[in-house]
C-alpha cells in the first residue's frame, strides 16, 4: 500500500520512526516532509499529505505534529480527505470502518511511537464497512467541501513562512 506521511519540525524524529515501521511492513512510503528540525509550519505538510491521498498518489495518509490538532485540521481542508485525529484504538478503527477515513493523525508529543505503530497498523488493516446510513452521512460531510482555487498555489503558505523565518511565531 502507498502511504503518504508528513509532519512539522517538532516531531520529525517520530515521523522517521513511523516511516521506517511502515516500510518494514512492506508499504511504500511517500514522505512529503519536513525532513529535518528546521522550524516550519504544520499546515504545509497536512496539505501535502491530503493532496497525495486526494489525488490517488497515496492510498492513505499519516500526519503528525506536536498534538495532532493543527496538522489534522489542515489535511481535512483538502477536498476528498477525511482525517481522523486519534488517540486510541477505538477511534482509529471507527474512523476507518464507519467514516471511511483516509488519513490518520497523531500528536507525536502526546502518543508514544510504539502506540502510534499499533494504531497505524490497525488503521491500515481496517476496512470500511459501508451501510446505507454511513454512506449518506459521508455524502453529507463531503457536500460541506468547497474547492478553493488558491489552495492549488504551491506558495499558499509563503506569507506565514516569512513570518516564521522572522521569528514572529513561537513553539
From Swiss-Prot:
GO terms for biological process: D-allose catabolic process; galactose catabolic process; lactose catabolic process via tagatose-6-phosphate; pentose-phosphate shunt, non-oxidative branch. Keywords: Isomerase, Lactose metabolism. GO terms for molecular function: galactose-6-phosphate isomerase activity; ribose-5-phosphate isomerase activity. Pfam families: LacAB_rpiB (PF02502). It catalyses: aldehydo-D-galactose 6-phosphate = keto-D-tagatose 6-phosphate. Pathway: Carbohydrate metabolism; D-galactose 6-phosphate degradation; D-tagatose 6-phosphate from D-galactose 6-phosphate: step 1/1. InterPro entries: LacB, RpiB_LacA_LacB, RpiB_LacA_LacB_sf. Its EC number is 5.3.1.26. PANTHER family: DNA DAMAGE-REPAIR_TOLERATION PROTEIN DRT102 (PTHR30345:SF0), RIBOSE-5-PHOSPHATE ISOMERASE B (PTHR30345). Belongs to the LacAB/RpiB family. Heteromultimeric protein consisting of LacA and LacB. This is Galactose-6-phosphate isomerase subunit LacB. It comes from Staphylococcus epidermidis (strain ATCC 35984 / DSM 28319 / BCRC 17069 / CCUG 31568 / BM 3577 / RP62A).
